[in-house]
């Protein structure tokens, strides 16, 4: 698959870049995507939720009312789950939500997500760019020129670039990621994908089947 390369002014440079068909042109596997996104979101959970159960509360164990003769139900002590401020029955406990997936399945999910983007014409390739100093206005101008600023956009960079990162971090709907860290969730969470020429080379090399 070939895509045109644009400059930061949004103009077609006349150059073409090749996207590996084993990454960007496969038949997407929806179930693999589902599992990978489910794992990503599960791994983000802290799992620190906790509610005290009856044995963990401090308070008097004296019975509030006598066992029989009141005509009502037995109440027990002040920590009873039946009462406001009492214990929780089967309350949440701290737990680890993360789970493992096979590397091959995760790779298939990532290629499926990228193939969906390519199929829907939501991938743009630009020339490599840099800033001498952090310039949010300059980065915003690039998004405007490429017509991707109104919806969520993910810029894929070949390497860490502090000035580019600082220029983009305050822009709404704009995220940056390194080419070697692309994952299924991040790709699908954005409407458009903007790759630099060197990013394409990294993706083609690392993720080809």
Swiss-Prot record:
A Pfam family this chain is assigned to: Ribosomal_L4
One annotated GO biological process: translation
Keyword Ribonucleoprotein listed: yes
Molecular function GO labels: rRNA binding; structural constituent of ribosome
Keyword line: Ribonucleoprotein, Ribosomal protein, RNA-binding, rRNA-binding
SUPFAM superfamilies recorded: Ribosomal protein L4
Gene Ontology CC annotations of this record: ribonucleoprotein complex; ribosome
Ribosomal protein found in the keyword field: yes
InterPro entries registered for this protein in UniProt: Ribosomal_uL4, Ribosomal_uL4-like, Ribosomal_uL4_dom_sf
Residue span of region Disordered: 45-80
PANTHER family in UniProt: 50S RIBOSOMAL PROTEIN L4, LARGE RIBOSOMAL SUBUNIT PROTEIN UL4M
Function text: One of the primary rRNA binding proteins, this protein initially binds near the 5'-end of the 23S rRNA. It is important during the early stages of 50S assembly. It makes multiple contacts with different domains of the 23S rRNA in the assembled 50S subunit and ribosome. Forms part of the polypeptide exit tunnel.
Family: Belongs to the universal ribosomal protein uL4 family.
Subunit and interaction comment: Part of the 50S ribosomal subunit.
Name of the protein this chain belongs to: Large ribosomal subunit protein uL4
Organism: Porphyromonas gingivalis (strain ATCC BAA-308 / W83)
Lineage of producing organism: Bacteria, Pseudomonadati, Bacteroidota, Bacteroidia, Bacteroidales
């Amino acid at each position: 698959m070939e895509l045109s390369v644009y400059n930061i002014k949004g103009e077609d440079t006349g150059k073409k870049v090749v996207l590996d068909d084993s990454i960007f042109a496969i038949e997407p596997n929806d179930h693999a995507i589902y599992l990978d996104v489910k794992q990503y979101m599960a791994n983000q959970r802290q799992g620190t939720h906790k509610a005290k159960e009856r044995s963990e509360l401090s308070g008097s164990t004296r019975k509030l009312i006598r066992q029989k003769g009141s005509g009502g139900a037995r109440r027990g002590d002040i920590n009873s789950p039946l009462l406001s401020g009492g214990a929780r029955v089967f309350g949440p406990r701290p737990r680890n939500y993360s789970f493992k997936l096979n590397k091959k399945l995760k790779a298939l999910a990532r290629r499926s997500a990228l193939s969906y983007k390519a199929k829907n014409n939501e991938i743009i390739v630009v020339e490599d760019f840099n800033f001498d100093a952090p310039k949010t206005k300059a980065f915003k101008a690039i998004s405007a020129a490429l017509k991707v600023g109104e919806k969520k956009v993910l810029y894929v960079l070949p390497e860490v670039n502090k000035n580019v990162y600082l220029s983009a971090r305050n822009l709404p709907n704009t995220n940056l990621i390194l080419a070697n860290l692309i994952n299924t969730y991040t790709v699908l969470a954005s409407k458009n994908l903007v790759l630099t020429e060197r990013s394409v080379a990294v993706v083609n090399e690392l993720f080809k089947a």
